Amino acid sequence: VTQAKRNFVSLLPDLSCSNLVEEKDNYTAHCIFSTYQTMMNCIDSVRDDNGKLFTCGHFDLVICDEAHRSIYNKYRDIFNYFDAPLVGLTATPKDEIEKNTYEIFDLENGVPTYGYELAQAVKDGYLVDFVTVESKTKFIEEGIAYDELSDKDKAVYEDTFEFEDGKLPERIDSAALNTWVFNEDTIKQVLHVLMRDGLKVDYGQKIGKTIIFAKNHDHAEKILEVFNKQYPELSKNGQPFAKVIDNYMTYAQSAIDEFSDADKMPQIAISVDMLDTGIDVPEVLNLVFFKKVMSKAKFWQMIGRGTRLCPGLI
């Protein structure tokens, strides 16, 4: 919501705007930004001299961002309540949008009112394309065999995979391995590929803004730990070069704002879900998929974090 309002104001500076999540008393702006839950609360509680402020005819237009999600069952009251035209926006491929989402907008399933494909946006100069750098590691591809590990890794293996009855599996196949935190050597290899092949700024002296998509919080913290061991010289003056940004943080939005600033650290954000969708940082040059993504819709949302234009960056 914060980013949406910020970008809207930059395009229409003379339009009065309000973010109801942060500005509790500014209800008279011409353009209102809100989460679904905040708006539902305001409909019930906000009043003026004539009674309820947000009547069914209060708005001339209602825009629903991230309309690919299963929003109707949870927030159908909002869509049924306001009688203004409803516009839904999503970056999800049209064949991945759920049927009930099309029904909200009175559309035939799989046929949006208007579609603008990534390839066309790149051709028209509104977005940039992506280039893949595939990195395969032995453990992820083949699994782990206990007898092939070093003594140090055997100790980690025993702590991680020992059964309740004390027995130890001889090997963990690649499919099962993806349910556990990746080992330190694998993380080192992935980080090495990033630091070697990732796009750079400052005349090639510094890795560009990067999002690493981690499997879970423990995995993210492990990646950060290994990064700091491998590249301690990059964090200077108390400013971390890499940082975990997820819902375990107390001030997540502040961390996102710092990452979004080209002149501030961190340069690398290690994220668990929080930066997968909905964040707009044009300076992001590198995306590291350090987890399996089973949803095609989510995958393209994640790809979108790195397709923004940023003239003069490199």
Residue ranges and their predicted role:
Residues 1-10, 214-220:
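Conserved Walker A/P-loop ATP-binding site and its immediately adjacent core
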Residues 17, 24, 30, 168-271:
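Conserved C-terminal RecA-like helicase domain
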Residues 37-39, 50-88, 93:
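SF2 helicase catalytic motif II
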Residues 37-38, 61, 235, 242-314:
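Conserved RecA-like P-loop NTPase helicase motor core
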Residues 99-207:
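Interdomain helical connector at the RecA1-RecA2 junction of SF1/SF2 helicase-like NTPases
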